[in-house]
């Protein structure tokens, strides 16, 4: 269980680092967030990021840095495709080429991700982490650790449609806002 938290924390840091320190991350991911009107403070508070293009860029890097492939798969950041008889098993990055929205539990630990494709030809606009030992979609609200105090103070909560709605509302100063994950 703890290993899944460790893998997700690594992935979040990797995606955030890619957003700020790669040409692809800056030109695609950071540009997208800036076009949405998000400030540096909001991008950093929500730990937003960018998953680079390439089928195995993230997974290869994680393995090279000592992360176990089985845990990458269990955490949902890597997809394993079993080869047919006589063919090799393959793996690839679940979120390649997407802006990344880490999903946090109530205490603020990263338990999953939502990734938004920016290319029109993408099969799915949003891809989310699969259910795992630490992430249960129906039990988690996106943005809750950042909204808790405001919900308590205001004694109400707005439920909005998606990740960008939550970050935009927080950007506007309305912080008692969450979305289903």
Where are these regions (language model features)?
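Phosphate-handling DNA/RNA-contact segment within nucleic-acid enzymes
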Residues: 1-13, 52-181
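Non-catalytic interaction/clamp surfaces of large macromolecular machines
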Residues: 1-44
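Short, well-structured beta-strand/strand-turn elements
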Residues: 36-49, 173-181
